[in-house]
């Protein structure tokens, strides 16, 4: 399992006092309020303040004190240690843990690795690109077992839930 998570990317400066504008890589931007420190280029830094602006997060990070300082961090990722990540509810997983998991059906047919997880209003969808593109709705009656430690997910056979075109 990954021990460091990317939670955002610095996309611009904000103001003249070293604040940075962050594009969040998490569904719930309010989780930034709970963060005390982050990693940038592997170096731990304290967060001094968190504000929100439309779909962006504005961070004041210790040691970044001027607009020129902030400019040098553009395009860098904001990361956190897994131990600092918010606790998950039962039967939920971090996307970073799901990506790369091998998916099999209950007949032990290998379907491919999860390339990404797509968030939709009704449910998440596992995206397998190879060997054949497949979109798997993350529903309890389709996804039968998730074993993150073994990077293995078992689903119902596709023929039982996918419409034929």
UniProtKB/Swiss-Prot annotation:
Stored SUPFAM superfamilies: PRC-barrel domain (SSF50346), Translation proteins (SSF50447)
Chief localisation class: cytoplasm
Location in or out of the cell: Cytoplasm
Domain of life of the source: Bacteria
Signal sequence range: none
Annotated ranges, domain PRC barrel: 89-161
GO biological processes: ribosomal small subunit biogenesis; rRNA processing
PANTHER family: RIBOSOME MATURATION FACTOR RIMM
Biological function: An accessory protein needed during the final step in the assembly of 30S ribosomal subunit, possibly for assembly of the head region. Essential for efficient processing of 16S rRNA. May be needed both before and after RbfA during the maturation of 16S rRNA. It has affinity for free ribosomal 30S subunits but not for 70S ribosomes.
Protein's recorded name: Ribosome maturation factor RimM
Name of the gene: rimM
